[in-house]
Amino acid sequence: MNKDFYISIFGDRYDREAVLFPASVTILLIVFALGNILHGYLEHIDVLDSKVHMTIFAILILIITKIMMWIIRTLSKNSIERLTYGKEKLNFPTISILLPSSSILSNEYKNRILLKAQKDFEIDLNTSISNQEDETKVRKVIAEVTNLIRKKVSRIERTETYLIKNIRYGRCRNMIGGSTIAILIQLVITIYSAIKGYSLFCPIISITISCMLDLYMFYIYKQAGIEYAKELFENYLICKNNE
């Protein structure tokens, strides 16, 4: 398969590991919940009857997967992150760990990052951060700086560790979004199954798995964000001024 075609369908490494994987898990959990209902319908349909049917079936799966990827990415970025880090995402780790009050990074390390940002982006961070008593305003200043840092880092050849941490954070966030979608759809399936007299075994097991997955991802989500933020700044510090 042509590499460009492959990327156009499945995306780059980040898309495949941080978005496609959660979307696939979400679809599988929903399909499992639909087990008894689908079995009743598929008994009357020979999906794999011909190459045409197989092609249509494959295209349908691809379309559903692409739609689910878009839904999960959109929901996770616009809802999960805002619920976790605030409406303006001012509590995001890339902001929080640079605050003077944060002990996650040493003061010396934070100063190195801020001094470099001051030179690179010609911003007077001394006045904006050190002499500012309103923490919300400080967070907004740091948010602007980290946004510039992220853009600068995106233009250089990032380390493998950075890519792994970025993917891990994105995958955690998108798994939370995906499992939340799965739970909502599974609840509808459970109610429908109860009304129609189908077995509730598959929907209940599926909901249980989705809830456990959701809780686990919430548990590691914030730590994944902190690890990503640390790696972002580490990559930034090795950037040359002209990059």
Predicted features and spans:
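Juxtamembrane membrane-interface segments of multi-pass membrane proteins
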Residues: 133, 137-174, 224-243
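Charge-rich cytosolic interhelical loops and cytosolic tails of multi-pass membrane proteins
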Residues: 78-158
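Hydrophobic transmembrane helix bundles of membrane-integrated enzymes that assemble
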Residues: 28-31, 35, 58, 182-193, ...
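Transmembrane alpha-helical segments and their cytosolic interface motifs
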Residues: 11-27, 149-202
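N-terminal first transmembrane alpha-helix
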Residues: 1-107, 198-201, 205, 221
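Generic, low-specificity signal for short hydrophobic/alpha-helical stretches with a mild N-terminal bias
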Residues: 50, 54, 127, 131, ...
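Alpha-helical oligomerization segments
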Residues: 193-243
